[in-house]
Amino acid sequence: MAIKLNGSSRSFVPSLRVSAFLIFIFFVITYIIIYNVSFSEPSWITQDALKQNIENLDDYDASCSGYSIGRILREQKRILASVRLELTESQVKIEEIRTVQEELQRLIPQKQLELSALEGEIEAAQRQLEELRETQNVKVFLPFSPLQIPRELEQPSQISPNQLDDIIDYSRCSISSFMPVYVDIITSGQSEKEWLNVFQEVIPNLVETPDKACIKIHISNGIASPNTTFNSILFNVGSPIINFQSKSIHVQASKIRSFDFPVDVNHIAVEKVDLTPLLPFQRENLISLIVDNTELNFSAFSSLSAEPSRRPIVIVKCSQENCSLERRRQLIGSSTFCFLLPSEMFFQDFLSSLQLGCIPIILSNSQLLPFQDLIDWRRATYRLPLARLPEAHFIVQSFEISDIIEMRRVGRLFYETYLADRHLLARSLLAALRYKLQIPTREVRRNQAIPLFNSSFTAPKGSVVNVQANFDDEYLLGPLESRVESTSYAYNFTEFQLYSYDFWNIIMSPHYTKEFLVNAAELPTEAEFFEDTKIGFRPIEPGSGAEFSKALGGNRQREQFTVVLLTYERDAVLTGALERLHQLPYLNKIIVVWNNVNRDPPDTWPSLHIPVEFIRVAENNLNNRFVPWDRIETEAVLSLDDDIDLMQQEIILAFRVWRENRDRIVGFPARHHARYGDSMFYNSNHTCQMSMILTGAAFIHKNYLTAYTYEMPAEIREHVNSIKNCEDIAMNYLVSHLTRKPPIKTTSRWTLKCPTCTESLYKEGTHFEKRHECMRLFTKIYGYNPLKFSQFRADSILFKTRLPQNHQKCFKYV
């Protein structure tokens, strides 16, 4: 019984294990079934209800029991794609914002410059307003009449006048009268009639009745006027009148008083092309002496001829056989020095000496010379007392060659300006009288411009200029001030004394009152800081380029310049040239000389910040470039070709340089003259010395335009017009002739080509041949080549200078 129990217990244990395993399997299956049932979609739930249920779920993770794995993945992909799209769009927006930010950052310096420019304009306007307030109360009125000093009308035999005041009644010559002149003849010979016509042509303020005249000129052939009155000029074309008690000013060759005018009115003029050249220096004779005075002992001059010399010393005792005019001129023209003795033929020989380039050695300290109280004859002649005749040979041989050539040149210039022909002599006499009486001439507008657009100088229509203001890469060029004209006719009375020497001996143009003066006196530099002298000055504050660009500074009051732009058959090129000048500081006006005489211009041209005036001309003439048009209201003139492309900073630099060198041509392309073989040639090759500046881009004083048009030899202008070339060479010759100075080159520019221009004068095959010939012809006309060499150019002070970080250069590129 016990064994069975044990056996039954062993069989019971495995059955329990099996039962437990089966139970475990049952629970697992049950759990799986329950799990599947819970995640299955009940058949009674529709798809729409399920979608609605999903859409209402806010927390996907907490409600995943409503989704299948596939749906979850698809939804997550959709969300990811949406987020990526949003990120892409945001990135694009960020890039756009960054671009705008960079553009704004880039514009900040330009806007700061614009702000500085506006501040400069406001400051300039405020200064101008203050200046106008200070000057608005100036009373302008005509001067009072001169005092009428009581005079006794003595008979000529009772008193001898010894000064100008004894024979001039100033009450008839107000300073505002412009010196009215009456002219008539006492004797009716052919010479008197010719002189009458000459005076009537040159007198600027001619009156028909003597009672309205300040000065009365009586032309006579050796006969004194029977009715001697005050303010009379006796112009004698005959034998000298000996009447030292006369109340008239005598104009004759001899027998004169201190206030008379010693002039040979019958001197025979010779064509200028026949004048003896200044070079070569050596001449056949060293000294020539013509002895006309029979009262002198001819043997007294033997010591002079005995002096040792490599060149002859010629002494001629005058007689009717060997003293013809031709013989005298031949002797004078072949001599370096002409010794002149006081005689009846003194003025004839004196003028011939000046004309033919023989240095006059005047053997007298008392001999009067033409207009000697105004003309400095020391520059062209040499005086010696007769007692120094034995020493004269040593004295003249000590002269430097350069001094002798300069005396020849100045003597020739005096002759050609004041004494060469009847018209010049009459004009010089009137100028001398005007200086003695201190009366300005009337303003004569000889160059009144004709508007191109009917009665208007400006175009009927204007086009907007799209060119932005040129600040030259963060460099301000100057404030855009309101237009200001140069003060004209400011030296109407100081010209008679302070500037008298310059007018008669340097610029040699005293015949008319000047609109401007090239080298007028400058105030001390500190004048710009004193209340009573600061008007017009624009001082530069301490600093470097930033301060420099805000004001004009310099040694003179503020001023502007006028562009004179010559154009012919290139409308598109002209339009581009005008647009490049937009917003250019210190520009007063642009004058376009329209050389297209065969057609009218278009009605539409660029509208700039200053007026653009078009002038109609009568012919296509290159000389039109240098006409002193009345529309030019500034001293500074920028002569431009329509095909010249300059940076604005280059123009401003050249203007600043010109302000300190007003008597010279200041510009860009340089040229020079060079000798090859026996001839002189025009040369445009690169060189280290130059003698000319092309006037297609150059600053010139307006006075030189007047000199070019009215004082330069007319045959030069005629040649320029005939060949349509060389006007720039002619201007360089003229300025160097008047100043004996070379032009000034600025910046490194050597050529200024126009890539878009299909036609140009310099492209002609004969261009250089014409210019070679021009130089030779002009040299012949002047009697020498006046061009001077220069071996430097002008750049701004801080150009190529290393500066600290907090400093700025004057200009960026020049």
Curated annotation (Swiss-Prot):
Residues on the membrane's Lumenal side span 36-814
Q: How is its activity regulated?
A: Binding to rib-1 is required for GlcAT-II activity and for increasing GlcNAc-II activity in vitro.
Q: Which residues form the active site?
A: D728
Which amino acid positions bind Mn(2+), per UniProt?
Answer: D643
- What are the UniProt keywords, alphabetically? Disulfide bond, Endoplasmic reticulum, Glycoprotein, Glycosyltransferase, Golgi apparatus, Manganese, Membrane, Metal-binding, Signal-anchor, Transferase, Transmembrane, Transmembrane helix
Membrane topology recorded in Swiss-Prot or TrEMBL: Single-pass type II membrane protein
What Pfam families does the record tag this protein with? Answer: Exostosin_GT47 (PF03016), Glyco_transf_64 (PF09258)
> What does the UniProt entry say about where the protein is found?
Endoplasmic reticulum membrane; Golgi apparatus membrane
In what pathway does it function?
Answer: Glycan metabolism; heparan sulfate biosynthesis
- Identify the glycosylated residues: N36, N227, N297, N322, N454, N492, N685
**Residues spanning the membrane:** 15-35
Principal location: endoplasmic reticulum
Q: State which ranges are Cytoplasmic (membrane side).
A: 1-14
Gene Ontology MF term list = acetylglucosaminyltransferase activity; enzyme binding; glucuronosyl-N-acetylglucosaminyl-proteoglycan 4-alpha-N-acetylglucosaminyltransferase activity; glucuronyl-galactosyl-proteoglycan 4-alpha-N-acetylglucosaminyltransferase activity; glycosyltransferase activity; heparan sulfate N-acetylglucosaminyltransferase activity; metal ion binding; N-acetylglucosaminyl-proteoglycan 4-beta-glucuronosyltransferase activity
Biological role stated in the UniProt entry = Glycosyltransferase required for the biosynthesis of heparan sulfate. Initiates heparan sulfate synthesis by transferring GlcNAc to the (GlcA-Gal-Gal-Xyl-)Ser core linker (GlcNAcT-I activity). In association with rib-1, is also responsible for the alternating addition of beta-1-4-linked glucuronic acid (GlcA) and alpha-1-4-linked N-acetylglucosamine (GlcNAc) units to nascent heparan sulfate chains (GlcNAcT-II and GlcAT-II activities). Required for normal ventral epidermal enclosure during the early stages of embryonic development.
Q: What quaternary structure, including any partners, is listed in this protein's UniProt entry?
A: Interacts with rib-1.
Name under which the protein is recorded:
Exostosin-like-3 homolog
Q: What is the lineage of its organism?
A: Eukaryota, Metazoa, Ecdysozoa, Nematoda, Chromadorea
